[in-house]
Amino acid sequence: MTNERKEVSEAPVNFGANLGLMLDLYDDFLQDPSSVPEDLQVLFSIIKNDDSIVPALKSTSSQNSDGTIKRVMRLIDNIRQYGHLKADIYPVNPPKRKHVPKLEIEDFDLDQQTLEGISAGIVSDHFADIYDNAYEAILRMEKRYKGPIAFEYTHINNNTERGWLKRRIETPYKVTLNNNEKRALFKQLAYVEGFEKYLHKNFVGAKRFSIEGVDALVPMLQRTITIAAKEGIKNIQIGMAHRGRLNVLTHVLEKPYEMMISEFMHTDPMKFLPEDGSLQLTAGWTGDVKYHLGGIKTTDSYGTMQRIALANNPSHLEIVAPVVEGRTRAAQDDTQRAGAPTTDHHKAMPIIIHGDAAYPGQGINFETMNLGNLKGYSTGGSLHIITNNRIGFTTEPIDARSTTYSTDVAKGYDVPIFHVNADDVEATIEAIDIAMEFRKEFHKDVVIDLVGYRRFGHNEMDEPSITNPVPYQNIRKHDSVEYVFGKKLVNEGVISEDEMHSFIEQVQKELRQAHDKINKADKMDNPDMEKPAELALPLQADEQSFTFDHLKEINDALLTYPDGFNILKKLNKVLEKRHEPFNKEDGLVDWAQAEQLAFATILQDGTPIRLTGQDSERGTFSHRHAVLHDEQTGETYTPLHHVPDQKATFDIHNSPLSEAAVVGFEYGYNVENKKSFNIWEAQYGDFANMSQMIFDNFLFSSRSKWGERSGLTLFLPHAYEGQGPEHSSARLERFLQLAAENNCTVVNLSSSSNYFHLLRAQAASLDSEQMRPLVVMSPKSLLRNKTVAKPIDEFTSGGFEPILTESYQADKVTKVILATGKMFIDLKEALAKNPDESVLLVAIERLYPFPEEEIEALLAQLPKLEEVSWVQEEPKNQGAWLYVYPYVKVLVADKYDLSYHGRIQRAAPAEGDGEIHKLVQNKIIENALKNN
């Protein structure tokens, strides 16, 4: 029986959704034990016969005992699975449940006397030594599962995790707050609520997106950070929307009241910035509203010196979630070493605060949670807190989601969910304690649903009774949490009623004192809002030179593999060609090899590289091969982990099939680690618009709004090659529309050596005031094009060139054609077949900032020039034409004719038929090269 007992101990204590089936099988077992599988025979025989599990019932027949046990099992399982539906988690306006499973003892034809005759072990094996009988154990379970915390965990597939949660929840435990801690907790709430009341009274109608109704969020965060400090976690990354943000800034990040009140008065808050440098607040030249701003606090207030960051955030709900995850991973990764980074999940943790309407409503949440257990993205478990005020602006839950709870969507990610009454502050603290213990044990996400209400409208100018009159009748009558908890402490004798009111008044006095320090006349005056001088120039070329032998040593190392490593023969032939630029006079470096050489030299310079995207390890077009696979064993080898004299890490991951969360993650990673060369590669550039929110609200505007620098690089495959409207265009026009104030660099290249120098220039700019995003319209067919490939001597010296020209005789040129990327190559190859010295092709490699000076200098050298043409593949209303036209119009003035050649205006980017594509493409080339 020893082995049999072990098997039972490892089996689930409850059968979840399979309980009905298991009970039917148990009936079959009673009739014929051989009718069920052997493992169930072991389990059922112990349930039926073993006194240590189920002792004989008093005064009943054995058959009745079996029936009674089955009913007890049903009751127990229902309480665990559905007790949350009757839990006391609603401070006000509890919902009316229409369909609640049976949860009472009487529902199962059981009574106290019967249950007292059954061992507590039948309820749960860990109850056997705690309670005298099943009745006592079930009372405990009812109190736990129907109390102020509602637990959902039976959906979790991992039995170890489920068992851990069951024991942690059901074992008698109470948050042991002594009287001093309770007083401190009351004071925290008084500060939280007092702050909101002061602003409400003194700045009537000003938007602040009050925390009132879910005030417990602040002490929950404080508890979380304190526990993290005890665990040695010294970097806390928080993401949240605007609801309650000002309160978190003041009471978690310790932003002085003077600074916050100054922002309401439109005076300069930076005059009150702590002189000790503990609070970092960046600001852009155009700025943002106060409830979008974040900050970084370095403090030992929570038990050890910690860095607590609240991420800047736009109004786009939930979009900050992947940014916070990326920032956390950056803090966890050690990148200043050769090889791959090492990740220590104990260095940092993410806390993401959601809204109850936005959490199930915004798909970015599901994309972000999907990153949780992936090697390239895991942060060791995120704490998710839903500030559930049970309304979204004016929309009530019945119109906001198709599920019972806003958190139901998280069940698919196998994480525990705790719903907690926001008015029961001690319960909210316990929920945090259990969540942090689970995270520490299993390194997985936990979701806490903080169920409260919204004291006022969506914003303080909004009247909620217009659309939600009935709920607000009850909310207005409902005491705030500082009074709910304060009165509880008065009743317990922890504080007196006078002490309660005295401290509430003291908070108002402190706020008034802070208010009085501010000079109302000290208004901010910055109407010009000029960008900083550091951004006056475009991305500067990196002029470092390399010897032939240096690059050859790197190349040889990248083509050297471990003994016994078996590369697919077909691939090996491709890789062996990378020796040719170094041992053949006519050898050329193609795009992929140029990238490998650039990456290797960047790693030697001490700049870490992180490259992610769908299929990025191989490359969508089978060109990169950064990760090699042994064709016999499947083992992998990454050559860029073995660069000679490597000083920083190379990290590459195939991403999940997601754009928004992955780009947000990489953006956040680079913001946190500005030395890191982060690159996101789209499978096709056409799919980049799935992350348009990140581009619009973070990447291209963050520095102007928040002073938040990023050097994230985007590789977006872009070219018209007959593959239809969804595999042709990275929507170049949209990036050029976002480009302003030297906020980025946008390129479409035609030379592998220029690509090499561009990557080095971007890497050199990182962690400087000149850093900015880089957008590369990367090639597809040009990856293997010999016109694009260049000899090695173009790599040993020189730098990035914003324009490239063919050789020409100045006095013979009558027409200049400006083109970019593949269009330039198509024109060049066509012109090579029918040479015409009167036509000069110019490759515009850098589109933004537009190379006006370089083009102007070139045109000035051409005395017989008559016409300047812009040629593009894209439709006239897309691509670069509408962007370049004002620049080129000024350059040609009335000296030359200006013409456009490209597709006509179209609603869709490209033709669907490949043959039609060829006809249109050839017509563009023919018309462009025609010399009138």
Swiss-Prot record:
CDD domains assigned to the protein according to its UniProt record, in alphabetical order: TPP_E1_OGDC_like
Enzyme class: oxidoreductase
Cofactor: thiamine diphosphate
UniProt xrefs under Pfam families: E1_dh, OxoGdeHyase_C, Transket_pyr
Keywords assigned by UniProt, alphabetized: Glycolysis, Oxidoreductase, Thiamine pyrophosphate
UniProt keyword Oxidoreductase present: yes
Single GO cellular component term: cytosol
Family the entry assigns: Belongs to the alpha-ketoglutarate dehydrogenase family.
InterPro entries: 2oxoglutarate_DH_E1, 2oxoglutarate_DH_E1_bac, DH_E1, KGD_C_sf, ODO-1/KGD_C, THDP-binding, Transketolase-like_Pyr-bd
Enzyme Commission number(s): 1.2.4.2
Protein species of origin: Staphylococcus aureus
Lineage: Bacteria, Bacillati, Bacillota, Bacilli, Bacillales
Record flagged with keyword DNA repair: no
Catalytic reaction(s) noted: N(6)-[(R)-lipoyl]-L-lysyl-[protein] + 2-oxoglutarate + H(+) = N(6)-[(R)-S(8)-succinyldihydrolipoyl]-L-lysyl-[protein] + CO2
GO biological processes: glycolytic process; tricarboxylic acid cycle
Sample GO molecular function, one term: thiamine pyrophosphate binding
Functional note: E1 component of the 2-oxoglutarate dehydrogenase (OGDH) complex which catalyzes the decarboxylation of 2-oxoglutarate, the first step in the conversion of 2-oxoglutarate to succinyl-CoA and CO(2).
Protein's recorded name: 2-oxoglutarate dehydrogenase E1 component
Complexes and interactors: Homodimer. Part of the 2-oxoglutarate dehydrogenase (OGDH) complex composed of E1 (2-oxoglutarate dehydrogenase), E2 (dihydrolipoamide succinyltransferase) and E3 (dihydrolipoamide dehydrogenase); the complex contains multiple copies of the three enzymatic components (E1, E2 and E3).
